[in-house]
A protein has these predicted regions:
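RNase H-like nuclease fold core
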Residues: 1-45, 49, 54-62, 134-135, ...
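RNase H catalytic domain
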Residues: 11-18, 52-136, 141-143
């Protein structure tokens, strides 16, 4: 299986508000950046969308090294919380509804197609690719500001 390294980030001005997402995919010395945004969204929806779009860009099952500064995304996947939420009808252990079940459902279907490895990185720090994703996500969010 090919190994693809993926860096993702999401941004939102206001929460909710205009938002953007970005992913950088690296494979065999090549790099591809994809990005987009929405007029009214949340930061967590943009973080999820970045990962979803990155995985949708893969044409075959891969080993995916995912780097994100979103503890929401990394913890829910790495610790299995998202699968638990789905099993309980999108209810969390605190009996509150899990947010963004539409995106989580899509993401869980995508991650099941790959061998996933999750890495949390501190945002706005020394990870150059994550910083580039952040900058692009912010630019995407600005396209929707009035």
């Amino acid at each position: 299986m090919k190994t693809v390294t993926v860096y993702t980030d999401g941004a939102c001005s206001g929460n909710p508000g205009p938002g953007g997402w970005c992913a950088i995919l690296e494979y065999n010395g090549h790099e591809k950046m994809i990005s987009g945004g929405e007029e009214r969204t949340t930061n967590n929806r943009m973080e999820l969308t970045a990962v979803i779009q990155a995985l949708l860009a893969l044409r075959e099952p891969c080993v995916v090294e995912l780097y994100s500064d979103s503890k929401y995304v990394i913890d829910a996947l790495e610790k299995g919380w998202a699968w638990g939420w789905r099993k309980k009808g999108w209810i969390k252990s605190d009996k509150k509804p899990a947010l963004n079940p539409d995106l989580w459902e899509m993401l869980l279907g995508l991650v099941s197609q790959h061998e996933m490895w999750y890495h949390w990185v501190k945002g706005h720090e020394e990870n150059e690719k994550n910083n580039r994703c952040d900058e692009q996500a912010v630019l995407e969010s600005r396209k929707f500001r009035t």
